[in-house]
Amino acid sequence: MLGDRDFRTTIKSSIEAVGKELDYAIDLEDSGKIHASEVTRCLRRSFYDRLDGLEPERSRFSDLLGGMFRKLEYGAKSAQYSLDNLKLEGQADMIVDDIVMIFKSVQVFPDDPFAKDLLYMNACMWIYDKIDGVIIYIDDKGKETSFSVTRDKKMFEETVRRVRTFEALLKEKKTPLVEPSIECSTCQYYERCFTQKKESKTLNLMTVSYTHLTLPTIYSV
């Protein structure tokens, strides 16, 4: 009977399966090739993904929005930017009339682009050698808002610095510092960062210092 079947589990499994298919293709074994998505978010999360990964929880099909565009015929193809002995890899969702585009799902529209989205877009513009980009946010009701951005050299230099830092930490197998953000509460590695098992003490996010963060100042666009 229908009532005896666990549809929530079936739906969750379906979303997770589709999510794996639509995720960025990252070679986790090659520390000489770094994906832009790894260094425009918390480095510790990317570090754990590489060396001791856990599957993230995907709960909404809307979270898969960007990957769906990339899989279409007119979706953007992955590209690389050479950094001497390193390769910075990235993939926009679409490129239309030389304009780089990425799509993100949100529940509430931001007043400005989220820092990690702006950093990722900027990296993509340098990787594809394009000047202009658009970040499009779409909510659960299908409404959208967008931000036009122009590539920025200083911001890209910060991304390159993070690439080199991440590559060095991977080689040394040295865990990066915590970079607190609103995403921590839903991160699959939350307990590794904010729970000290030996002392059975839980750290409060609000008491963690933000002084070590290295993301550049994000300006309105």
Language-model features and meaning:
Residues 48, 190-193, 199:
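Secreted/processed peptides and extracellular or luminal domains of membrane proteins
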Residues 42, 184-187, 193:
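Short cysteine clusters
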Residues 166-184:
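Immediate flanking context of iron-sulfur cluster ligation sites
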Residues 1-100, 105-115, 122:
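Metal-dependent nuclease catalytic cores that hydrolyze phosphodiester bonds in DNA/RNA
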Residues 211-217:
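Conserved small/polar residues in nucleotide/adenosyl-binding loops
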Residues 81-171, 191:
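Nucleic-acid nuclease catalytic cores
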Residues 54, 196-205:
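Short cysteine/histidine-rich zinc-coordinating motifs and their immediately flanking basic loops
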